[in-house]
Amino acid sequence: NITIDGGSTDVKNVGEYRIIPFLKAGGIGKIDYAIITHTDADHINGLMEIMEKSDIGGVKVENIIVPLLTGFTEESYNNFVNVAKIRINILYIKSGEYMEFGNTKIKCIHPGSTKEENINDYSTVLSLKYGELSMLFTGDISSKVEPKIKNELQGKYTFLKVPHHGSKYSTSRVFITDKSGF
């Protein structure tokens, strides 16, 4: 079982009241890998609740995958990693690396080693392939990052998780129509 992000700024206690009940209704008591694209509250606070309540909530997180950001001083990122390390195995991923889980292959497209001005532009971008299904997860990257990752995209995608919740500062027309095949 793999999750990518899990949080909300609109729903209070999203882990306890939305994510855990959803997982339990599907018979899921364990998340093998929780992939964190970046540490904004709307991407992690539900997963933090799951980790904190694993003894009483009944859902355990085995591993957390976070972007490898060397020399990164963002307080929320460092705090999240330090808290998670107490209970959970932390794995780091960087651009160009692959993970395989059975028939599922995930390639990390971003972040690379380039220094970014905008904190959201450090978001992990993942290409996931499962049989004929292909998905692109973009975190909260801005339109400035989109041209940097276009050459790494792997053919047509069945599904796109639009960058930054579809905000006007991301998901440029060129990104969607040129070469990526959405």
Which role fits each region the language model picked out?
Residues 1-182:
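Non-globular, low-confidence helical/coil segments that flank catalytic cores
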